[in-house]
A protein has these predicted regions:
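Local beta-strand N-terminus motif with an aromatic residue
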Residues: 13, 157-159
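Glycine-rich Rossmann-fold phosphate-binding loop(s) that bind the pyrophosphate
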Residues: 20-22
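Conserved beta-strand-loop-beta-strand element in the redox core of flavoprotein oxidoreductases
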Residues: 135-157
Length: 159
């Protein structure tokens, strides 16, 4: 069950993250942990942290990224450790330089873990809405994003 806390429906944020898949969750958590007032806009809050049909974390490529995210204080590795069903060392027949780790995870438990991490994070507001457009200011040949337009909440501004 998703538990969204609208701490306040402030429409001005330091950072706005669109989507709450793996990278959206990590981006929202990282910016809020750095003290930025952060919004994460999701179309369906029940899909926060939702894993694909192959619910695994790790492997030769993704395992490298997960390790780096973990070293920087990210949540993906913690969620994988808390919700794994199976743990494997891959490429055992080869040398230790190419060994990698992979977990198969319970996708429902993983999503619940990530939902709890976002809901309980200070400086983070979850907004269930659809981003329809970016607000872009073209200033002296240096365009930058000022915020987003959403279907139900209108304009959300960012720094």
């Amino acid at each position: 069950m998703v538990n969204i806390k609208y701490k306040s429906m402030n429409k001005s944020f330091d950072v706005i993250v669109i989507g709450a898949g793996h990278s959206g969750c990590e981006a929202a958590l990282a910016s809020s942990r750095l003290g930025c007032n952060t919004a994460v806009v999701v179309m369906d809050a029940s899909k926060i942290g939702w894993m694909s049909c192959n619910p695994s974390i790790g492997g030769p490529a993704k395992g490298q990224i997960v390790g780096e995210i973990d070293a920087l204080g990210g949540e993906m590795g913690k969620a994988a450790d808390a919700t794994f069903l199976q743990f494997r060392v891959l490429n055992r027949s080869k040398g230790p330089a190419v060994h990698s780790y992979r977990t198969q995870n319970d996708k429902y438990d993983y999503a619940a873990y990530m939902n709890d991490a976002l809901v309980n994070q200070s400086n983070l507001t979850i907004i269930e809405d659809m981003v329809t457009d970016l607000i872009i200011e073209d200033d002296n040949d240096s365009p930058h994003v000022l915020g987003v337009h959403t279907k139900f909440h209108g304009e959300l501004l960012s720094k």
